[in-house]
């Protein structure tokens, strides 16, 4: 026997049954899905075992480790100086006066007075170079002078670097790239002699450099040709007497250093040098396309009638 159903509930059931028979509308919803790309592996940041440098030094000291002190310095190698310390002043009229004349004796007296500073410098140089002697050095300096100038004939710059300093090298090879040099040594008119010696420090007093000025009175030949073989300066078959004061330098602190040619002292009373011969191109006459140079030259040589 069925139980009675209340009126309100029966109407509710009928209503729900009607909605259940209706078609269901499905709506499309937008869904955002995050896609991860391949990320680069980043290792974790290591944590320092010692927070401060002081703790690290204390631990190293206990472990018996010696940590050298870090110096923010960069080594600089100075192979030569940039000039002459105390330039020698050649006496006026040198090599022209006799040593027995009054002027010659005066020059020798002044040279002896200035010799005191040179003696102190010689003692300083001998502390680093025990074999340095003023009697033997002039011949050695003359050999260096001759060999350095002969390197210009063959353009042997590698050998020239060992004979001259970095200060003297540009002065010797300047403007000789496309030229031919013919230099020759004939003879010595007077024995080479040391006239000036100086010793000084660069940057500090422990970095010592020695400079020796040698007087060379020689006879030489010199000729310079351009790249086309035309003579620009001098003559190969005409020797000339040359008086030069050459400065030689050495880095005394370098145990493997050697004496090299550093500079030349040119006195104010020295005669002027021979000018360089310059060749110029003289432009010819302007010709028309149908004219020839021989025809115009022949026309120019025709006599003009009055």
UniProtKB/Swiss-Prot annotation:
SUPFAM superfamilies: NTF2-like
Gene Ontology molecular functions: structural constituent of ribosome
InterPro entries: mtLSU_mL45, NTF2-like_dom_sf, Tim44-like_dom
Localization annotation: Mitochondrion
Gene Ontology biological process terms from the UniProt entry: mitochondrial translation
Main location: mitochondrion
Keywords assigned by UniProt, alphabetized: Mitochondrion, Ribonucleoprotein, Ribosomal protein, Transit peptide
Gene3D superfamilies cross-referenced by the UniProt entry: 3.10.450.240
Residue ranges the record marks as coiled coil: none
GO cellular component: mitochondrial inner membrane; mitochondrial large ribosomal subunit; mitochondrion
Known partners and oligomeric status: Component of the mitochondrial ribosome large subunit (39S) which comprises a 16S rRNA and about 50 distinct proteins.
Function: Component of the mitochondrial large ribosomal subunit (mt-LSU). Within the mitochondrial ribosomes, required to direct the nascent polypeptide toward the tunnel exit and position the exit at a distance from the membrane surface.
Record family assignment: Belongs to the mitochondrion-specific ribosomal protein mL45 family.
Protein name per its UniProtKB record: Large ribosomal subunit protein mL45
Originating species: Mus musculus (Mouse)
Gene: Mrpl45
């Amino acid at each position: 026997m069925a139980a009675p159903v209340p009126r309100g509930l029966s109407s509710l059931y009928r209503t729900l049954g009607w909605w259940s028979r209706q078609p269901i509308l499905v709506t499309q919803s937008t869904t955002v899905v995050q896609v991860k790309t391949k990320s680069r592996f980043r290792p974790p940041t290591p944590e320092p075992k010692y927070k401060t440098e002081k703790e690290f030094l204390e631990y190293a000291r206990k472990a018996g480790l010696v940590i050298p002190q870090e110096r923010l310095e960069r080594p600089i190698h100075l192979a030569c100086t940039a000039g002459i310390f105390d330039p020698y002043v050649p006496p006026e009229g040198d090599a022209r006066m006799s040593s027995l004349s009054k002027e010659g004796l005066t020059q020798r007296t002044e040279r002896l007075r200035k010799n005191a500073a040179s003696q102190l410098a010689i003692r300083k140089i001998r502390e680093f170079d025990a074999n340095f002697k003023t009697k033997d050095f002039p011949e050695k300096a003359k050999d260096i002078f001759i060999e350095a100038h002969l390197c210009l004939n063959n353009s042997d710059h590698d050998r020239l670097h060992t004979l001259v300093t970095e200060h003297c090298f540009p002065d010797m090879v300047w403007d000789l790239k496309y030229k031919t040099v013919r230099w020759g040594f004939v003879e010595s008119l007077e024995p080479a002699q040391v006239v000036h010696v100086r010793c000084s420090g660069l940057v500090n007093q422990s970095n010592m450099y020695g400079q020796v000025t040698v007087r060379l009175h020689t006879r030489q030949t010199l000729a310079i040709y351009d790249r086309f073989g035309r003579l620009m300066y001098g003559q190969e078959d005409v020797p000339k007497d040359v008086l030069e004061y050459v400065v030689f330098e050495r880095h005394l602190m370098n145990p493997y250093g050697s004496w090299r040619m550093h500079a030349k002292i040119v006195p104010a009373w020295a005669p002027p040098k021979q000018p360089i011969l310059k060749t110029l191109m003289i432009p010819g006459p302007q010709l028309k396309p149908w004219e020839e140079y021989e025809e115009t030259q022949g026309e120019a040589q025709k006599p003009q009638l009055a």
